[in-house]
Amino acid sequence: MRGGHKGGRCACPRVIRKVLAKCGCCFARGGRESYSIAGSEGSISASAASGLAAPSGPSSGLSSGPCSPGPPGPVSGLRRWLDHSKHCLSVETEADSGQAGPYENWMLEPALATGEELPELTLLTTLLEGPGDKTQPPEEETLSQAPESEEEQKKKALERSMYVLSELVETEKMYVDDLGQIVEGYMATMAAQGVPESLRGRDRIVFGNIQQIYEWHRDYFLQELQRCLKDPDWLAQLFIKHERRLHMYVVYCQNKPKSEHVVSEFGDSYFEELRQQLGHRLQLNDLLIKPVQRIMKYQLLLKDFLKYYNRAGMDTADLEQAVEVMCFVPKRCNDMMTLGRLRGFEGKLTAQGKLLGQDTFWVTEPEAGGLLSSRGRERRVFLFEQIIIFSEALGGGVRGGTQPGYVYKNSIKVSCLGLEGNLQGDPCRFALTSRGPEGGIQRYVLQAADPAISQAWIKHVAQILESQRDFLNALQSPIEYQRRESQTNSLGRPRGPGVGSPGRIQLGDQAQGSTHTPINGSLPSLLLSPKGEVARALLPLDKQALGDIPQAPHDSPPVSPTPKTPPCQARLAKLDEDEL
């Protein structure tokens, strides 16, 4: 076959052949013609440009009629030539005898024989594309578009916020359906058919207060969210208003580790049979985790709604408060789930006040005789309002759970607590001291991995001790305390040095000077002093804390003590008012 492609040559002629072969009108049946593509300038040789190229055989398959388009231009020549080919080749000429054949006998003669350079692929693309076919680059297209007006941007942001709100409502419907599978499925079936003897009395642990959560969302909260579709401004008030009601999620999460343990015992037998009987796709454990996931999801959706609502130029003050609420409640839920995995503590954790913080420290604990151990141990430390608990993390989950568990090791009551900060100038180290009923001192040295963690704990512990100190001072001298508070408020400045400042709490040399003089050193006297001696026991503390305070006039009316509560503790107390 003529013009066959030889190995090692450029593939450009083959590309041209494939493109031209798709247009059957360009060739007469049985005709053969040789085309030669020019070099880098993009022009076409005379054999192709004229439309009546020199024939490859003794007679031409095409006649040089007046319909020939003539030599095309350097860029769009090939396209113009293709556009006129159908008209030019409409009259089929006589083919040489024995030369006629199907389209597969066509062959384009490469220009390699003439020594001409073949064009690059980019040039071929330019030839095949007409000047009107070129697509504008994205950058130029973006620049050419007129920037959106501020009103259009706000409109789009508002539309996106409504999309987030719609997603919130739709996912709420799905959430209620999932809770219904538990309450109207598992719980109703177990109540009707009874439970195995080994599970009797423990079925309430499995479900906790999930029925209460389900009924509230089904009968009230879902309808309120649907109302927000017509009145989006109501969304923020909805979450702020029901902050206390959302405390039921904290109760549920506190019970969740116990529920996981019971379900793990019966999940492969009894609960699996119930699932097949009810025809549910999800297992019971997958449904029981839905409330935990949902309380986290509210936070994410509210943040997205706040972002777009703010871009739309709407008032977002209430929304920011709602986001703050829904960031706080999930944190409390997570804390309660962690506490549910604490084992070995004799007493009720719920009676120790709110969990204010938890972190992992390298702790040097006291041994027999009050001396510090020669080596430290890794401990998970929990800070409550009334107690500090030291625990050891277990390698695996507790009683079949997937999350890490903790075993109680030691504790310090806040009423016996003292604080020493920045030991030996190290911002990562501080000490907590505990005074026993017989006056003995136990000292725990804590070292954090990050100075920020250590300083945060020093601040939180100091704040607790300061609040307790103020409360005791108010009990001992309510008139003087009230007068001091009135003077502070009238001057419009904070009441004394801030938490962790040298004026209130000596975290430097004074704290290191006497390891047996904790900041709250006089508090244990409340446990030992008989009635009537409390005031005398607290007198040194009162003088140290309050200094020289002017005496109140004798005719001053008695004022009841009003110890202040930090805002964060006030919010915690608000959540703890259980109206469920």
Curated annotation (Swiss-Prot):
Effect of P478A: Reduces exchange activity mediated by GNAQ activation; in truncated construct
Effect of L472A: Reduces exchange activity mediated by GNAQ activation; in truncated construct
Pfam families: RhoGEF, SOS1_NGEF_PH
Region of interest: Disordered: 48-76, 128-157, 482-524, 545-580
Region named Sufficient to bind activated GNAQ: 467-493
UniProt main location, coarse: membrane
UniProt cross-references to InterPro entries, sorted A to Z: DBL_dom_sf (IPR035899), DH_dom (IPR000219), PH-like_dom_sf (IPR011993), PH_domain (IPR001849), RhoGEF_Guanine_NuclExch_SF (IPR051336), SOS1_NGEF_PH (IPR055251)
Transmembrane is among the record's keywords: no
Species for this entry: Homo sapiens
Task performed by this protein: May play a role in actin cytoskeleton reorganization in different tissues since its activation induces formation of actin stress fibers. It works as a guanine nucleotide exchange factor for Rho family of small GTPases. Links specifically G alpha q/11-coupled receptors to RHOA activation. May be an important regulator of processes involved in axon and dendrite formation. In neurons seems to be an exchange factor primarily for RAC1. Involved in skeletal myogenesis.
Ranges annotated as biased composition (Low complexity): 48-67
Tissue expression notes: Isoform 1 and isoform 2 are highly expressed in excitable tissues, such as brain, heart and muscle. Also detected in kidney and liver.
GO CC terms of this entry: cytoplasm; cytosol; extrinsic component of membrane; myofibril; plasma membrane; sarcomere
Domain DH: 160-336
GO molecular function: guanyl-nucleotide exchange factor activity
GO biological process, one term: regulation of small GTPase mediated signal transduction
Domain comment as written in the entry: The guanine nucleotide exchange activity is autoinhibited by the PH domain.
Biased composition regions of type Pro residues, renumbered to the chain: 555-566
Biased composition (Polar residues): 509-520
Domain of life: Eukaryota
Entry protein name: Rho guanine nucleotide exchange factor 25
Keywords of the record: Cell membrane, Cytoplasm, Guanine-nucleotide releasing factor, Membrane
Result, substituting I479A: Reduces exchange activity mediated by GNAQ activation; in truncated construct
Subunit structure: Interacts (via the DH domain) with POPDC1 (via the C-terminus cytoplasmic tail). Interacts with activated GNAQ and GNA11. Interacts with RHOA, CDC42 and RAC1.
Location of this chain's protein in the cell: Cell membrane; Cytoplasm, Myofibril, Sarcomere
